Amino acid sequence: RGAALTALQGKDGLPYEDATCLARGFEDELWIGTTRGAIRQTRDQYHYFGAYHWLPADRVYDIVAGDRVVYIATDGGLGIIEYQPYTLQKKAAYYERHLEEWGHKRLGFTHRLYWAGEELGWVREISDNDGGYTAHYLAAMCYKYAVTGDEATRREALDAFEAMVWLEEITPIRGFPARAIWSVVADKGHKSEHGSGGLPAKGYPTPDGLWEWKGDTSSDEVNAHFYAVSLFHDL
C-alpha cells in the first residue's frame, strides 16, 4: 500500500543492467552494485565506477554509505570511495605529488608508467609520446605560473621547456624533433619497441654514443611542441 515500482534500464541511461545490490547514499542518491562495477544515480545523472580504477574487482556484492564515504565489497576486496571538496590548486598538488613520487619524471620529461607484475612493479616507459606528455605538463605549468607567479612552478616549466628543446636539438635535422631520448648508459626503464606503420622502433645514436633518439615523429607530437612552447613564450 502506497508503494511504487520504478524500473531503471540501459535505455534510461543506466550504464550496466546486471544489478546485484542497492543502497541509499549520503546525499539521498542511489548506489547500484552490478557484476561489472558500481553505479551512482543522482537526480538526472549516472556515475560509473569500474574495476582497477575505482574498485579492486568487477563484481560488487554489497554497498554501504557513510558520511561522504562509500564502502563497496567486491570479489577482489573492499573498495572505498571518499568524497572530498577540491579546489583546482589542491587537485593540481595531488597530481604533481603523484608525478614526483611514482617516478613519472626524468631529465625534464614526463613519462608513462605501466604495470610489469608483482616482481618489477611500475616501470617507466621511454616511448613515442614522451614529447606529447611533456608538452602537456609544460602547458599546465605555464598556466599555473601565469595565475600564481610561483617561482617553483616557473622552474618546473623551464625544466620541461629545456627537455622539449633537447628533443629538437638532438636530431641532425634542423626543426625536426625526436619522439624520445634514451640514455645508453643510465636508463633502466622500458624502451619503446614499435615504430610508425607497424615497423619496429629504431634508435639513432648521437656522435658521442651516449644517447639514442627515436624518430618517425608524428604530426600530433609536432602540434604538441608548437602548443606548449608558444605558451611558454607568451606566459
Model-flagged regions — what are they?
Residues 1, 35-39, 76-79:
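Loop/turn residues immediately N-terminal
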Residues 2-4, 42-45, 84:
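Short loop/turn segments that connect beta-strands within beta-propeller blades
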Residues 7-27, 50-67:
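Short coil-to-beta transitions that initiate beta-strands within beta-rich domains
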Residues 105-107, 111-117, 127, 155-235:
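Extended ligand-binding groove/face enriched in aromatic
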Residues 121-166:
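General structural concept
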